[in-house]
Amino acid sequence: MLEKESVKLLSKSLASMEAGFDLPHSAQSIEYARMAEVLEEVAKRMQNNYPYFHPLFAGQMIKPPHPIARTAYQLAMWINPNNHALDGGRESSKMEKEVVADLARMFGFGQHLGHLTGGGTMANMEALWVASQVRRGKIVASDQAHYTHQRMCEVLKIPFEKVKGDRAGRMDARALEQMLKTGDVGTVVITMGTTGLGMVDPLDEILALRRKYDFRIHADAAYGGYFRLAKNLDPHTQEKYELLRNVDSIVIDPHKHGLQPYGCGCVLFNDPSVATLYLHDSPYTYYTSDELHLGEISLECSRAGASAVA
């Protein structure tokens, strides 16, 4: 029932990784008998979870990661890289840049800026923070949008307002235009797959409104982002996903339909110049090369390099 063959592959990969380090022998003091007791207790306690890993469970996002993602994450934990700076994880930082570039390409972004996060909540907060620095004004989102947007606006002290949804649960573009006429909207958050109904906001209509009123568009695709790859969407929905190349920022959660271990979110920006907003200096934070250290473009400091490896 639980896939276990990958454990053998992990042992082999560990030996290969160890062979790459030319270090003097170092013995670790580990009480394996006690460790076995603890793991047995953990195994029993973990039985008090719903078995979402079984195919009988459908229609929810708490799926186990892909076997290779899970095993790669475990392998990385023997190093435990920190992708804040290259010194903490040179190769895992390189992998993160590759992953982010792949996701940006999936949405049609050319030049881009982005990084992985602990999840969609942190990624959305960062996107809203950048939006507030670039374009002053309140942030609006559909009344079907995830509650995190209103909450993060409260944290960031940014005015927030809900836009009425239509009968299908999508943002009502006519109601949005009434708000835009006031001239005090800085950013419109669209949802690509609402949590309750899985609906996609009318990006085509919202882009037309942007040409008229000038505002930022942030796409919350934490849940629905990977449907960009789906081949069975209706043409109108498919068009909305293709139009994502025109938004200012996108959030996607690889730990949902990307089959990655929790927590792994990602924030992407269409304009790399927003990197200047992250500039900071302190006597205990410095970077040892001209190559980009991901901590230079992230609100989070320590971040698990294992997420990028997976």
Can you name each region flagged by the protein language model?
Residues R135-G183:
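PLP-dependent aminotransferase-like
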Residues G88-S92, G114-T121, A141-D143, T191:
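Active-site nucleophile and cofactor-binding loops and adjacent substrate-binding regions
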Residues H236-A310:
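Active-site C-terminal subdomain of aminotransferase-like
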Residues E126-W129, Q150-V155, G198-P202, F227-L233, ...:
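Short acidic, glycine/serine/threonine-rich loops at helix termini
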Residues S93-A101, H112-R136, T148-M152:
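Conserved beta-loop-alpha segment that forms the PLP phosphate-binding cup at the N-terminus of a helix
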Residues M171-A219:
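Active-site phosphate-binding strand-loop segment of PLP-dependent enzymes
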